[in-house]
Regions:
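Glycine-rich phosphate-binding loop of ATP-grasp-fold ATP-dependent ligases
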Residues: 115, 146-172, 198, 221-241
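Glycine-rich phosphate/pyrophosphate-binding beta-alpha loops
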Residues: 220-222, 292-306
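Conserved N-proximal alpha/beta basic substrate-recognition cap immediately N-terminal to
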Residues: 2-8, 20-140, 154-155
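Phosphate-binding site of ATP-dependent enzymes
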Residues: 171-226, 279-292
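Peripheral (often C-terminal) accessory segments that flank ATP-dependent C-N-forming ligase machineries
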Residues: 314-355
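A long amphipathic alpha-helix within ATP-dependent nucleotide-binding catalytic cores
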Residues: 182, 211-214, 223-288, 324-327, ...
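ATP-grasp fold ATP-binding core
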Residues: 115, 139-162, 183-193, 276, ...
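A short alpha/beta connector and helix-capping loop motif
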Residues: 168, 304-317
Length: 355
């Protein structure tokens, strides 16, 4: 996946930036691309030092880059992975922000998940999980026939799965195993999601967190995995979101999230993008906002979609940014491919313009 999708990073690149395309599972070696997404000429000399800007900080990726022969004669300068970065990369951080928003802005406390740490043995873990599931089930909010389970470090819909109720022994056994392996799991109400959004921020070297853009995206119902982003002007996105909540409430939420992020990252050297996922859910006859589903301390698909709109969507047009399994879509009046891949490709990325 990373090998095929790496040329998409040209949406973020400019000037003399280089893009690292990792080796493919089929054995195609790693290579470097220029800011336009084209292969660098063979034998091209690299600078003595390169500052590395990662999609997201990850020990595995850092190790891969350090060991890559492409950089044998180049010193790579990596951003530090600090305790505060690791803390905010854990899904527990979204609980902490949600608790803050519940306290400061009055969002319902029934939205708060239950974080269950693995016990000293399987029996202790099972008791904790049973009690937490019963506690979530007793809340007036959510689907009474299931709860939602999340693993601590997964994102973009991965590691998220519904647990059917009443609880069956085989499902409980699998959940105990998952909690034991990952160290903890989150259990929360299963809500009827109507509309998915994200607030995208940037953090500067001075530590200031600023609003960057809105992201309006679709997910697959099964597992709630990412499906695509709505591409339209920032003004239109703002108008769409403030048709679902008041502008005052949105500005208050943005200010509160910025305040919390600046405080939590005060000892961090992280600079770059931060995405906070939201969604609107149905509660009886009402549509309500979940103000913090997930924190993504990295570049997000929403940021990529923002630049795809700026660079590829004609003035006055709207569309959808798609990332899918399978070969690329053929160009047409309504399809703009973003990857020039073969018919054997495993993934495709394209813009589908409104007709």
């Amino acid at each position: 996946m990373r090998h095929e999708l790496s040329p998409l990073l040209r949406l973020l690149a400019s000037g003399e930036d280089l893009i690292y395309a990792p080796a493919s599972p089929e054995g195609i070696p790693a290579r470097l691309l220029n800011a336009e997404g084209d292969d660098l000429p063979s034998g091209c000399d690299l600078p003595a030092e390169l500052s590395v800007v990662l999609w997201g900080l990850d020990d595995h990726i850092v190790r891969e880059l350090r060991e890559c022969p492409l950089f044998d004669s180049t010193t790579l300068l990596f951003p530090p992975i600090t305790p505060s970065y690791l803390r905010l990369s854990h899904r527990r951080a979204s609980y902490d922000l949600l608790a803050y928003l519940t306290d400061q802005l009055g969002y319902p406390s029934d939205l708060l998940p239950r974080w269950i740490e693995a016990g000293v043995d399987r029996s202790a873990t099972e008791l904790r999980l049973r009690a937490a599931i019963e506690g979530i089930k007793s809340r007036p909010l959510g689907d009474p026939t299931r709860v939602l389970i999340k693993r601590p470090y997964s994102s973009s819909g991965r590691g998220v799965f519904p647990l059917p109720l009443p609880l069956q022994e085989k499902h409980l056994e699998a959940l105990v195993g998952s909690c034991t392996r990952s160290g903890s799991v989150s259990i929360e109400p299963y809500l009827e999601v109507v509309d998915n959004w994200a607030l995208e921020y940037t953090r500067s070297e001075s530590g200031e967190v600023s609003f960057f853009a809105l992201s309006h995206f679709d997910t697959l119902p099964s597992g709630r995995a990412y499906l695509g982003n709505i591409l339209t002007s920032p003004e239109d996105l703002w108008e769409r979101l403030t048709s679902l909540m008041s502008e005052e409430a949105l500005l208050t939420l943005i200010n509160a999230q910025c305040t919390w992020l600046e405080k939590e990252l005060s000892d961090s050297q992280y600079t770059g993008y931060i995405g906070i996922d939201l969604f609107f859910y149905r509660d009886g006859e009402c549509l309500r906002l979940h103000p913090c589903v997930e924190i993504n301390l990295r570049t997000t698909m929403g940021v990529l979609a923002h630049f795809a709109y700026e660079q590829y969507v004609p003035d006055g047009r709207k569309g959808i940014f798609r990332l899918e399994r399978g070969p690329r879509q053929q160009p047409s009046q309504s399809i703009i491919p973003l990857l020039l891949t073969s018919s054997e490709a495993h993934f495709s990325a394209y813009i589908e313009l409104e007709k």
